[in-house]
Each structure stands twice: as structure tokens, then as C-alpha cells.
Curated annotation (Swiss-Prot):
Stored Gene3D superfamilies: Cyclophilin-like
GO molecular function list: cyclosporin A binding; peptidyl-prolyl cis-trans isomerase activity
Taxonomic superkingdom: Eukaryota
Function: PPIases accelerate the folding of proteins. It catalyzes the cis-trans isomerization of proline imidic peptide bonds in oligopeptides.
Gene: CYP3
Species annotation: Gibberella zeae (strain ATCC MYA-4620 / CBS 123657 / FGSC 9075 / NRRL 31084 / PH-1) (Wheat head blight fungus)
This protein's name: Peptidyl-prolyl cis-trans isomerase H
Keyword terms: Isomerase, Nucleus, Rotamase
An annotated GO cellular component: cytoplasm
Predominant subcellular localization, coarse grouping: nucleus
UniProt KW DNA-binding keyword: no
Enzyme Commission designation: 5.2.1.8
GO biological process, one term: protein folding
Compartments reported by the entry: Nucleus
Domain PPIase cyclophilin-type: 15-181
Upper classification of the organism: Eukaryota, Fungi, Dikarya, Ascomycota, Pezizomycotina
Length: 182
């Protein structure tokens, strides 16, 4: 596999190595839009690298966490490394959530990385990857990145059967087995 070329924007690149049911699926590389939403991008980047620490100094982040919600023709949601079921959230500043940075970027294409939230100003560790344009999410969820390489992996995740363990929960664990910065 040839080395990943960095984006001309100078924005950071991070990656997820994904497994389904314990079997390697592939790598997704994301460009984080630090130039537009620096705070939101940095929150995600630190959870990818493991730089973020709990109050007692333990690393915390996405490595080993699951995508707990997958809806075909919509999105794949993950980032709850606290509880694994969509109920947990935190941010790198030691709070449960932080404010919406801005809504400059729109949900106008597949492969966008956006903050999952429970309403205005409730961003934390949870995120989703769009699989189609989702303009109805504009001005409600902060777009902070996009798939740079590996949309084929996202589409395979999207095709994972759901429903056995909960309506939108994958039947097989979809796990971020490794993650970091390029």
C-alpha cells in the first residue's frame, strides 16, 4: 500500500483500523478540519492518539471502542469509549461536553465526520460518519472532518447487519482496533 499523501490544507490526518466480529476490515483515514473548527478537531485528534488522560492520568480514547449505532443510508456512530452503548461522553477538557464551535461546514456529502450530540452545546467524544448527504443535520451537528481514504471500509461497516442486540446496534462488534495520527 503506498504511503498516504498529506492534504494540501495542512490539516491533521488521523486513522482508524476497523474490525468486524474480530476480523480485520481495513483502515479509514480522516482529514480533520482544524482550519475551520480547531477545538472540535483537536478533541477528536487527542482521542485518536490517546493523548487525552482521565483525571487520574489514565489514557482515554477510541482504541478498542465500538461503533454502537449503524443506520444504512444515513450514518455509522461511535465514540462512546466510556459505556460502549451511546450513553457515555466526555471531552479532552475534563467535562462531559463542550459547546458547538460553529456550523460553517454542511452535511452535503457522504464521508463527513460530525459530532453526535444530545442537543445544542453537548459535544463530547461521540461522532458519526455520514454515508449519504444529510442536510437536515445542518446547524444541529458540527462537521469537523471527512474520510480522506477508506470510504470502502465505511460502506462495508454500513452494510453490517443490525437488530439482534438492539434496533440500530450491529449484530457483530464493529471495533476501532487501532487508531492514531499520520
Amino acid at each position: 500500500m503506498p504511503p498516504t499523501k498529506l492534504p494540501e490544507s495542512g490539516n491533521p490526518l488521523v486513522f482508524f483500523d476497523i474490525t468486524i466480529g474480530g476480523e480485520p476490515l481495513g483502515r479509514i483515514t480522516f482529514e480533520l478540519f482544524k482550519d475551520v473548527v480547531p477545538k472540535t478537531a483537536e478533541n477528536f485528534r487527542q482521542f485518536c492518539t490517546g493523548e487525552s488522560k482521565t483525571p487520574v492520568g489514565r489514557p482515554q480514547g477510541y482504541k478498542g471502542s465500538k461503533f454502537h449505532r449503524i443506520i444504512p443510508n444515513f450514518m455509522c456512530q461511535g465514540g462512546d469509549f466510556l459505556n460502549g452503548d451511546g450513553t457515555g461522553s466526555t471531552c479532552i477538557w475534563g467535562f462531559k461536553s463542550f459547546e458547538d464551535e460553529n456550523f460553517t461546514l454542511k452535511h452535503d456529502q457522504p464521508g463527513l465526520l460530525s459530532m453526535a450530540n444530545a442537543g445544542p452545546n453537548t459535544n463530547g467524544s461521540q461522532f458519526f460518519i455520514t454515508t449519504v448527504p444529510t442536510p437536515f443535520l445542518d446547524n444541529k451537528h458540527v462537521v469537523f472532518g471527512k474520510v480522506f481514504e477508506g470510504m470502502d471500509v465505511v460502506k462495508k461497516m454500513e452494510a453490517t447487519k443490525t437488530g439482534y442486540r438492539g434496533k440500530d446496534m450491529p449484530n457483530l462488534d464493529v471495533v476501532i482496533s487501532q487508531c492514531g495520527e499520520m
